[in-house]
UniProtKB/Swiss-Prot annotation:
GO biological process: glutamate biosynthetic process; glutamine catabolic process
Alphabetical UniProt keywords: Hydrolase
Protein name in UniProt: Glutaminase
Pfam families named in the record: Glutaminase (PF04960)
Enzyme's top EC category: hydrolase
NCBIfam families, A to Z: Gln_ase, PRK00971.1-2
Similarity field: Belongs to the glutaminase family.
UniProt catalytic activity: L-glutamine + H2O = L-glutamate + NH4(+)
InterPro entries named among the record's database cross-references: Beta-lactam/transpept-like, Glutaminase
UniProt organism field: Rhodopseudomonas palustris (strain BisB5)
Subunit structure: Homotetramer.
Transmembrane segments: none
Residues binding substrate: 66, 116, 162, 169, 193, 245, 263
EC number annotated for this UniProt entry: 3.5.1.2
Length: 311
């Protein structure tokens, strides 16, 4: 594919999204996110050769929220391997991202690492043997390394906002603790969790960080192997089946790519062998996924023939 076609397609989609009035609703249960301008939109595609096609607010940082769960899972698998799956499953939940219902039925084992309970369990594993500040520093440095950008930071105002209002997450963590799923003090685990969800990145930085997932675990520009090809495929499989809460099936149906959303309005998507894609629009749909983000990605895969299920 020519870079001219990619640039033109991204620019056209960004222009189309800017003109739409159906933008969804910003997350209002996290006070800092409720203040975000709903008119924002950014899109970045980085192809296998490292060419960057950007449109809209491509360099405006936003709160990545649950997209961080892809990277904490990657770290945890590197530390503990398959022991991760003793704490968390690999099945779609079919329920809201902060639901406690399945934890009650399944003795505190979360369905997958991308719902809140699952990500808290994964965070607890990363924290084990470390102080919270050390674990959080490891996560942040990993993100900076993947994006090749040491300027990536944590938005402390967002983290504090989540800590003040994250009662449902506290309930999830305490419930898992009662079943012995968490090893560390709940307050420590939640502190690290809230802070890695509050990492702020632009679409450009996020697409760069996700490149290893599009290329069999390897960054094609640096040649660095982040994970094995098999592990990259398995992370992508989980992103496809579980990456969008109870909207994962709809995303797979319409977009046809592995992806992970966050309530900050971002989506990281992977076109295996082709590109890493990041889109941001803060208005959400009923499942907590970016409304225009999904529409933009559907348009992108249709026009470029990138769905993993065929043209």
């Amino acid at each position: 594919m020519s870079t001219d076609l990619l640039d033109r397609t991204v620019a056209e989609i960004a222009e189309e999204m800017a003109q739409r009035t159906d933008r969804g609703e910003v997350a209002n249960y996290i006070p800092e996110l409720a203040r975000v301008d709903p008119q924002g939109f950014g899109l970045v595609v980085i192809d296998a050769d490292g060419h960057v096609a950007a449109g809209g607010d491509a360099d405006l940082p936003f709160s990545i929220q649950s997209i961080s769960k892809v990277f904490t899972l990657t770290l945890a698998l590197g530390k503990a391997g398959d022991r991760v799956w003793r704490r968390v499953g690999r099945e779609p939940s079919g329920t809201a991202f902060n639901s406690i219902v399945q934890l009650e039925r399944e003795r505190g084992i979360p369905r997958n690492p991308f719902i809140n309970a699952g990500a808290i369990a994964v965070t607890d594993l990363i924290l084990s043997g470390h102080q919270p500040r050390e674990a959080l520093g490891e996560i942040l440095r990993f993100m900076q390394f993947l994006a090749a950008d040491s300027a990536i930071t944590i938005d402390e105002a967002v983290a504090a906002s989540e800590q003040r209002t994250g009662f449902r997450n506290a309930a999830l963590a305490n419930y898992m603790k009662s079943f012995g799923v968490l090893d560390n003090p709940v307050d420590y685990t939640l502190g690290v969790y809230f802070h890695h969800c509050a990492i702020a990145m632009s679409c450009r930085q996020l697409a760069m960080a996700g490149r290893f997932l599009a290329h069999n675990g390897r960054n094609p520009s640096t040649g660095h192997n982040v994970v094995s090809a098999q592990r990259a495929r398995r992370i992508n499989a989980l992103m496809l089946t579980c990456g969008h809460y109870d909207g994962s099936g709809e995303f797979a149906y319409r977009v046809g790519l592995p992806g992970k959303s966050g309530v900050g309005g971002g989506v990281l998507a992977v076109a295996p062998g082709k590109a890493s894609i990041a889109v941001w629009s803060p208005g959400l749909d009923a499942s907590g996924n970016s409304h225009l983000g999904r529409i933009a990605l559907e348009a992108l895969t249709k026009r470029l023939g990138w769905s993993i299920f065929g043209v």
